[in-house]
């Protein structure tokens, strides 16, 4: 079971080592105090990318070169980030310009401001986010949209089932027809000049990128589509 695995490396798992050998990056730290961290780990397993669950400050070591903030309950996660001592090392990671990916609650944690909550966490995005914008659990839904801000003749389209090129970070990439799973998700109420809109649904912005910060209001980890995780690993 994925949830039982704390860390996968070349030394500890020869099965994963073959897939991980071609991945040109270190370990992805997945915040694991609450929420859908196991699903993100399963996605990285499929891509042969090593990961480590972050439950306490001592889990955040020099091997980690990128961080995932999973979906869940943002207020609870915010409190646990402080009590576990993980807030400071993750904040330093973000301030250093290293890659971070937030989904749903993770987008809230990365927001520069919330328009319906006085809390501010990492403040990494030049954007105002609205918590629980899509209402209660019964308001959850699935949509399909292209993901990526690239337009014109130089945009590289990646269709469902295709792999994102390893050079994606330096190319104009559009992920075609990506499945968007919303569970009481937020959306972006205001987008500042530094952030780039990656996708929208019904006029609401639900995907942003700002440098090495990637954030979605939806849950790509709850689908069978690995393309956004591939894009994140290319940052």
Report residues per predicted region.
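N-terminal beta1-alpha1 cap of cysteine-dependent amidohydrolase-like domains
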Residues: 1-83, 88-92, 151, 158-166, ...
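C-terminal and late-domain segments of enzyme folds
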Residues: 2-19, 140, 153, 160-179, ...
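A secondary-structure boundary/capping signal
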Residues: 32-33, 103-105, 125, 184, ...
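Hydrophobic anchor at the start of a short beta-strand
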Residues: 51-52, 100, 213
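Redox-cofactor binding/interface segments in oxidoreductases and associated redox assembly factors
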Residues: 68-69, 102, 216
């Amino acid at each position: 079971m994925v949830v039982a695995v704390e860390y996968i490396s070349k030394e500890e798992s020869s099965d994963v080592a073959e897939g991980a050998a071609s991945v040109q990056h270190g370990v992805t730290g997945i915040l694991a105090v609450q929420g859908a961290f196991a699903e993100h780990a399963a996605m990285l397993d499929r891509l042969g990318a090593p990961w480590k669950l972050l439950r306490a400050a001592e889990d955040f070591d020099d091997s980690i070169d990128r961080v995932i903030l999973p979906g869940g309950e943002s207020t609870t996660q915010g409190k646990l980030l402080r009590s576990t001592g993980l807030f400071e090392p993750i904040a330093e990671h973000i301030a250093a310009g290293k890659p971070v990916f937030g989904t749903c609650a993770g987008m809230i944690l990365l927001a520069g401001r919330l328009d319906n909550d006085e809390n501010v966490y990492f403040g990494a995005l030049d954007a105002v986010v609205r918590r629980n914008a899509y209402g209660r659990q019964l308001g959850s839904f699935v949509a399909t949209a292209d993901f990526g801000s690239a337009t014109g003749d130089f945009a590289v389209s990646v269709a469902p089932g295709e792999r994102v090129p390893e050079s994606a970070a330096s190319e104009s990439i559009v992920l075609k027809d990506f499945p968007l799973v919303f569970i009481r998700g937020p959306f972006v109420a205001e987008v500042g000049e530094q952030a780039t809109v990656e996708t929208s649904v019904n006029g609401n912005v639900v995907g942003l990128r700002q440098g090495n910060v990637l954030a979605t209001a939806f849950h790509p980890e709850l689908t069978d589509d690995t393309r956004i995780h591939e894009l994140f690993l290319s940052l």
